[in-house]
């Protein structure tokens, strides 16, 4: 089974998102983080599911609304590069 790994920035993104959402609703934060990890496993299994991002060479994206998961293919699976809110200035965060 293909694997995924989290880049340090992606790990940080997930922690920040979880903390932020938990301030309002702990259960929602728990469900959201769970959805992220379910999505990572699915993307590892089917890496072409995500949208190719020509503006970010080597990256693909997949929405976990309202967030966007950015990842890249690796020989042994995928690497999750970032998990960003869709309303953020993604170009500046992925440079």
Name every feature range the model reports, one short phrase each:
Residues 48-77:
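Basic/aromatic recognition patch in beta-strand/loop cores that engages polyanionic ligands
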Residues 67-68, 72-95:
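Enriched for short, Lys/Arg-rich terminal
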Residues 1-3, 73:
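Extreme N-terminus of proteins, especially the signal/transit-peptide cleavage junction
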Residues 3-55, 59, 95:
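Basic, Lys/Arg-enriched alpha-helical interface segments
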């Amino acid at each position: 089974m293909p694997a995924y790994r989290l880049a340090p920035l992606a790990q940080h993104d997930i922690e920040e998102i979880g903390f932020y959402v938990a301030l309002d609703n702990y259960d929602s934060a728990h469900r959201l983080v769970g959805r992220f990890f379910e999505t990572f496993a699915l993307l590892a299994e089917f890496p072409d599911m995500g949208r190719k991002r020509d503006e970010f060479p080597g990256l693909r994206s997949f929405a976990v609304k309202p967030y966007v998961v950015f990842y890249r293919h690796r020989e042994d699976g995928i690497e999750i590069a970032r998990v960003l809110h869709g309303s953020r200035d993604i170009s500046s965060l992925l440079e």
